[in-house]
Curated annotation (Swiss-Prot):
Protein keywords: Cytoplasm, Nucleus, Protein transport, Repressor, Transcription, Transcription regulation, Transport
GO biological process: protein transport
Function: Component of the nascent polypeptide-associated complex (NAC), a dynamic component of the ribosomal exit tunnel, protecting the emerging polypeptides from interaction with other cytoplasmic proteins to ensure appropriate nascent protein targeting. The NAC complex also promotes mitochondrial protein import by enhancing productive ribosome interactions with the outer mitochondrial membrane and blocks the inappropriate interaction of ribosomes translating non-secretory nascent polypeptides with translocation sites in the membrane of the endoplasmic reticulum.
High-level lineage: Eukaryota, Fungi, Dikarya, Ascomycota, Pezizomycotina
Organism domain of life: Eukaryota
Bias (Basic residues): 56-71
Gene3D superfamilies in the cross-refs: Nascent polypeptide-associated complex domain
Keyword Thylakoid: no
Regions of compositional bias (Polar residues) in chain numbering: 27-40
Annotated organism of origin: Aspergillus oryzae (strain ATCC 42149 / RIB 40)
PROSITE patterns: NAC_AB
Subunit and partners: Part of the nascent polypeptide-associated complex (NAC), consisting of egd2 and egd1. NAC associates with ribosomes via egd1.
Span list, region Disordered: 1-77, 157-196
Record-given protein name: Nascent polypeptide-associated complex subunit beta
Amino acid sequence: MLNRSPSGTAFDHENGKLTHTYPQCIISPSSSHTRSTPNSYKPDHESTRLTNSLKNRGKGTPRRKVKKVHKSSGADDKKLQATLKKMNVQPIQAIEEVNMFKEDGNVIHFGAPKVHASVPSNTFALYGNGEEKELTELVPGILNQLGPDSLASLRKLAESYQNMQKNQAGAEGKKDDDEDDIPDLVEGENFESNVE
């Protein structure tokens, strides 16, 4: 037996099947016949955007925060240790300090570092906290470590320091002279005597 519903569908009760639907109707198996409205139609790009956003979360749930994973330096240290072990580095004992001279005249100073070396591969590893210092800060104890290039830079540094001090002394002398060269604004009158 076929029943025609006013919504434009035919349903066969004996077989329990839907025999015919009209294009303007939408029938879902869980609910009764539902008619679509012209406003419920969405273009493809909007519907895919909405379905993609709903796949990740349900309605009313807060947005999921992305967890930022910070790499620890421990993993890098382990890789470095493994590479150094392959190179067969050996520890060097009784190193009090290590100084690295930069081109700008500054020095990277390591106090009591751990030093490992592999002479065949010309590799040295320093472990410790390095501080960048000026060459003048380390001058008394560093003179025996200076090579010919560093000695030349030390001479230049000393010359520039002396020139700077001469310029400062000359500038102070000029300031004193400038105070004496103040012209009188009114000829013949001295206002300083009135103040005293």
